[in-house]
Amino acid sequence: MKFNEMTYTRPDIGALLARCKELAAKAAAAPDGDALVRLYYEQSEAFAEYNTAANLANIHYTCDTRDAYWKAEQDFFDANGPAVTNASVEISRAFLANPHVDVLTAKFGTTCVAGMKNAVLGMDDRTVELQQQFNALVSRYQQIYGGALVELDGKQLTIPQLGPYKEDLDPAVRRAAYEAEAGYFDAHRAELDELYGEIVKNLNAQARVMGYHDYSELSYVRMNRIGYGPEEIRKFRDQVANDVVPQLQKVMALRAKRTGIARPTFTDLPIMFKDGNPKPIPGYKARMDAARTMYHELSPETAEFIDFMQDNELFDVESRPGKMSGGYMTSLPTYKAPFIFANWNNTSADVDVLTHECGHAFEGYVAERDPEVPADLECPGMESAEIHSMAMEFLTAPWHHLLFGRDTDKYALLHAEDSFVFLAYGCEVDEFQHIMYQNPDLTPDERNAEWLKLEKKYRPWIDFAGLPFYGRGAGWQRQLHIYECPFYYIDYCLSTMAALQFFLLSLDDHKDAWERYLRLVRRAGMASYTELLETAGLKVPFEEGSIKGIAQQMTDWLETHQV
């Protein structure tokens, strides 16, 4: 069914909550393991209609944040979502109370029962009102960001549409683009500062109600991190600071030499090549045709997937006024249909987001069609889900010539370099958030000062050269995740460590790398992050010294593939 033929009906929350109570009672009373397994499948399907409606509403709202009807529907789910989540948690609580619960681990793997325990530990009826308030705060942020229109080059442009100007070979044009963006954020400075303060206060209040010191502790439970915690993440960040950042300084020196910009400032960083960055082929149809060919040649599984996605028009990837920034993949369970949202801006990032979100969508497509995988175990934790997307960016490399033509080698270098350099920024975002939630009384200026300290630690090569907004340490406010889904960002770093290993493996044997990837994908959400890495034969990055060799291999490859 094509996306525009999918019907939306606001769900009956009362009926759903009553059904949840019934399922919880049945879970508590299930007489044996077989009955409990059957009931787990049943409860997993019970939310399909609700989730489909919620995701349809969110797709329509993010595609046009100015549409009053879809704004009202989004508000409905913001208001009712916490109650539905808590009802789901009560079902988990009932499963956990059943003496046969260990059968679920035997049937579905470690993440099933561990995930239910995290769900119970991460939710509380007393926080429902606070959760509703948090959702409303996020919607306010999305409206500020999604409603951004700036004047440049005689045009009204969205933030994503500034992308090509930021990559212009004329430094004055790049500076003007960043200043236009900065002007918009500075104009909303007071509101953005106030919003973030309210978000920190709200989430810390939720944590304290539930007996946690602050939200940085609760986040590990709510993010469903299984098998590791704050100490492992700290060790990971330390390895990045000590073993990756020194290599990145060499990489940035190579970039400066390559571009001929001897002393690059922040607005020079998007320039990767003296004669301009690689540009993908123009035109929606041409790109979609190339993507279809690419996925048909990659594997039979991806051929079936891309046909389904394109034939059912499950993409909205072109930027326009009123559309929310960013990119995502979501799922419409009733239709077993993934959906991909993006904001193309005619830079190489268009291919990044296409292959990235197709990685998420491919995993969802495969899991939704596996009868052994319950609906709520179709997707693993976010640090693992991002492996599907980030590794897909690299594993499609043999077909990138279809999208870049003569710029293919430039894109290969740019993409590998960007992914490697990203590790530092991702760790910076994570450490910043730990500081913010552990020190909630910091003033807006003090928050910005902390960000600038972390810039020196993780990205010492950056010179803001007096740039508004960024120069005062407020650039973090442009990072949607910090407002919308705190503590998510480190997941990108953990998955990048897996993706870089897939990249290095593919250089030696692409077929073997793809088969390892497919094994990982097919485990869906029924294995933890470390178990998934072991499935694919990859190193776990929490272990001391585990990153150093990968960092050296990446630097060596980048040194020998300068264009």
Where are these regions (language model features)?
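Post-HExxH zinc-binding segment in Zn-dependent metallohydrolases
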Residues: 242-243, 367-368, 379-407, 415-416, ...
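Long, well-ordered alpha-helical segments
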Residues: 196-213, 251-255, 359-369, 390-407
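Active-site recognition of the HExxH zinc-binding catalytic motif
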Residues: 342-368, 389-390, 394, 432, ...
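C-terminal, non-catalytic "cap/extension" segments appended to globular domains
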Residues: 115-117, 227, 318, 354, ...
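Inter-helical turn/loop segments and adjacent helix faces that build the functional surface
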Residues: 230-231, 254, 258, 298-301, ...
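Auxiliary, metal-adjacent structural segments of Zn-dependent hydrolase domains
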Residues: 274-334, 347-348
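A well-structured
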Residues: 1-278
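Glycine- and acidic
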Residues: 122-123, 179-188, 228-234, 269-280, ...
